[in-house]
A protein has these predicted regions:
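N-terminal leader/linker segments that initiate helical-solenoid repeat arrays
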Residues: 23-62, 71-76, 145, 156, ...
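Catalytic glycan-binding domains that act on GlcNAc-containing polysaccharides
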Residues: 300, 312-315, 337, 349-352, ...
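Residue at a conserved register position within TPR or TPR-like alpha-solenoid repeats
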Residues: 48, 85, 122, 165, ...
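Alpha-helical segment of the N-proximal tetratricopeptide repeat
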Residues: 39-63, 161-164, 168-169, 196-206, ...
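Structural motif corresponding to the intra-repeat A-B loop/turn of tetratricopeptide repeats
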Residues: 51, 88, 125, 168, ...
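Single-residue signature of alpha-solenoid repeat helices
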Residues: 57, 94, 130-131, 174, ...
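Short solvent-exposed coil/turn linkers within tandem alpha-helical repeat scaffolds
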Residues: 32-35, 64-74, 101-113, 133-146, ...
Length: 711
């Protein structure tokens, strides 16, 4: 049996809270409402502010301040009153309010922001020479903030401000601004400033702009060696490999060029490798190994050498590189990649000795985790060598022990009647033992035996049978002994939940909840997350976490909480998600963005469950996710892929914004459809940022199996 990864294309608002200090367990107050009924309150003033009606907002905020209302969130009232005044260019009033906030609330989350904007308001009010401000006593971060903000507002001082930021701090955003608006003047700056601008522009992704500065510096013979390195890299990244090769050669020819020699050797070797000049590439890689034997790039190079040897069916040479990598860099991911490559090639060549050599190492590396992953390799290898008895042992072990439906489904394709009967008998025994311990109120032992039950028919048919229902019913009765679960199902009113939380956290949570009910979701999140991180987790805390985190679009943070939901009632759910109550299972595997996913998936004839699986594993449903490789948004689309999809007549989003949930989902589903329809499903990984394809696919397909059963 060849090992295949099947990606299923078609199957995928508080009255003012002033009495919280007297809350105690013996006397719980009733709070019938939890927002102010005053016609003018924080909510109405904030809406005016957010709608751009700053003068009206300022007047409302100052009325609240002078009336001593909203005491619990007074720092926020003052802050947005100051900000409204600032936007009206009432700088004196803004400064007075920012000063008031800093005086009254030195520990407020808003203090540093007030400090920044107060300095900015003073800058605009005083209108003194730019150099006076930058020569002042303000801290660097204040000067940078004021400078960058002033660049967006001033017209007669922007060049001077940008130069101050560049000369003093090499501020990246100021460099980009100056380059975009005063490029001719930039080319005439002192060479040391020009070089720093070039490197900052390069790191920020403005490669062509940086190239102009590097070329200018080379002509003036300033820091020529380093400039040569950067120009070589830019040409390489722009796929101008022949020109890059020449420039790398010039740079490396002078052994005194030390600053970027390490990177120069590596990238030059990589460049020649892409040019199919293997001899030159290998020579450069060998020089790198000699000069930098402990560098993190070494296992990458070993992997290249190993694959060259494997392509030539030279297991002896490949094994030497693998051994070096295992010995010197045992925990490096490239070592793992090399091991798997060696193992696959040995198996393909039917070399039993080397196959089992590689398998033994793989087993040692994963002896404590991912046992079913190792079992899958054993099944595959035993099958390839026609050792069917051993294969069947591993199949049965998978069916009896694995909690990953992805691997169980694979094992079921090879299972015979005797194996299935073995599982059924084992399930019957475990159920009887679980019932005995449950009758004795020994709940830990009950769960122990329930966890041993393998729901293979549920996995195969996606329908709960008698066994599953009975096991889940017993588990829920055990979970209901816990206060968290009991409170979850108690159907308490929101006032009751709020009062309980006030007892647990005193004043800490009330501010965030008040902000939430007034619609200030992001600030509610900022305040509440601090509490959640340090307070014992209870149901009222979880209740408001769900409301606040989701309404502030911090879905990823809530997913991180839900992924550990079992710890709130003492059950390591990862052992068996199926035993959890339905509501808890759907917290772990939620269907967010249903209104976007379902119709689009239906249009392209792709199962929505597959889309949710990708979003869950790629971004934890975080629409602002950004990977180290540049993949963006919910489905982690690469910009080039998204631009190509956006040319289709069905879309043409303008402007294209991959952090927009709708755009990301629509373009992602469209691209998946193309991959499947063009029979490129095996290349599906190309459009996603992944380091370990095999493990990634395992996670996505595991999620798919749960989604397809829970909805």
């Amino acid at each position: 049996m060849k090992k295949r990864i099947f990606l299923l294309a078609l199957s995928f608002e508080l009255i003012i809270i002033i009495a919280t200090s007297v809350l105690n367990a013996k006397s719980m107050p009733e709070i019938p409402d939890i927002i102010s009924k005053n016609k003018i309150n924080y909510k109405t003033a904030l809406k005016l502010h957010n709608d751009g009606k700053y003068l009206d907002a300022y007047n409302q905020f100052t009325n609240i301040i002078n009336g001593n209302d909203e005491a619990l969130i007074r720092d926020y009232v003052i802050y947005y009153g100051a900000k409204s005044a600032f936007y009206c260019e009432m700088f004196k009033e803004a400064i007075d309010l920012y000063s008031l906030l800093m005086k009254e609330h030195p520990r407020s989350y808003l203090y540093p922001y007030a400090e920044q904007y107060k300095a900015l308001a003073e800058f605009y009010r005083d209108d003194y020479p730019v150099s006076n401000f930058f020569n002042g006593k303000a801290q660097k971060w204040i000067k940078e903030f004021v400078g960058l903000k002033a660049l967006q507002k001033t017209n007669n001082k922007n060049k001077e401000i940008a130069l101050e930021l560049i000369n003093r701090f090499y501020t990246k955003d100021a460099i980009i601004y100056f380059n975009n608006n005063f490029q001719k003047e930039a080319l005439n700056l002192p060479n040391n400033i020009k070089y720093k601008m070039a490197t900052e522009l390069y790191e920020a992704g403005f490669r062509n702009s940086s190239l102009n500065y590097f070329n200018s510096l080379i002509k003036q013979n300033y820091n020529k060696a380093n400039c040569l390195y950067y120009t070589a890299r830019i040409n390489q990244q722009e796929n101008k490999r022949e020109e890059a090769a020449k420039l790398f050669d010039i740079y490396l020819a002078n052994t005194n060029n030390k600053s970027y020699r390490r990177l120069g050797l590596y990238y030059s070797a990589d460049n020649y490798y892409k040019l199919k000049n293997t001899k030159k590439s290998i020579s450069l890689y060998q020089t790198f190994l000699k000069e930098y034997p402990k560098d993190d790039y070494v296992p990458r190079i070993y992997n290249i050498f190993l694959n060259e040897s494997l392509n030539a069916n030279n297991l002896i040479s490949a094994k030497r590189y693998l051994t070096n990598s295992l010995k010197k860099f045992p925990n490096n991911r490239w070592t793992e990649t090399s091991l798997k490559s060696y193992l696959r090639k040995s198996l393909r060549l039917k070399n039993k000795t080397e196959t089992y050599y590689g398998l033994k190492i793989l087993e040692e590396r994963h002896s404590k985790l991912r046992n079913d992953f190792i079992l899958s390799w054993n099944i595959w290898i035993a099958n390839e060598f026609k050792d069917f008895n051993k294969r069947d042992e591993y199949v049965l072990e998978t069916l009896l022990t694995s909690k990953n439906p992805y691997y169980i489904k694979g094992a079921l394709t090879l299972a015979n009647k005797d194996m299935l009967q073995n599982v059924y008998s084992n399930n019957a025994y475990n159920m009887e033992e679980a019932k005995k311990f449950f009758a004795d109120s020994n709940y830990s032992k009950t769960l122990e035996f329930l966890n041993k039950i393998q729901f293979i028919d549920y996995i195969a048919t996606k329908r709960e049978d008698k066994l599953v229902k009975e096991a889940r019913d017993i588990a829920k009765k055990i979970f209901m002994q816990n206060k968290f679960v009991k409170d979850f199902y108690s159907k308490k009113t929101e006032n009751e939940i709020f009062n309980e939380l006030s007892l647990q956290t005193r004043k800490e949570s009330n501010k965030s909840i008040l902000l939430y009910y007034y619609g200030d979701n992001q600030n509610a999140y900022n305040e509440f997350d601090k509490i959640y991180s340090k307070t014992q987790t209870t149901y009222p805390l979880f209740y408001y976490a769900q409301k606040i985190f989701l309404n502030s679009a911090n879905t990823k943070r809530f997913m991180q909480i839900c992924n550990n939901i079992g710890k709130y009632f003492g059950y390591p759910y990862s052992q068996n998600v199926d035993l959890l109550p339905e509501e808890f299972r759907k917290y772990i595997y939620p269907r967010y963005f249903d209104d976007l996913v379902v119709p689009e998936a239906k249009y392209y004839k792709i199962e929505p469950e597959f889309i949710y699986s990708i979003m869950r594993e790629e971004s934890l449903f975080d629409s602002k996710a950004l990977s180290w490789a540049g993949a963006r948004g919910l489905m982690q689309l690469m910009p080039a892929t998204a631009r190509a999809e956006n040319k289709k007549t069905r879309y043409k989003f303008n402007p294209l914004n991959l952090y927009d949930s709708k755009q990301n989902i629509y373009l992602g589903i469209s691209h998946l459809s193309w991959l499947f329809q063009s029979e490129n499903a095996s290349n599906y990984i190309i459009f996603i940022d992944i380091e370990e394809t095999e493990y990634y696919v395992e996670k996505v397909m595991k999620s798919y199996e749960y989604y397809s059963r829970y909805y």
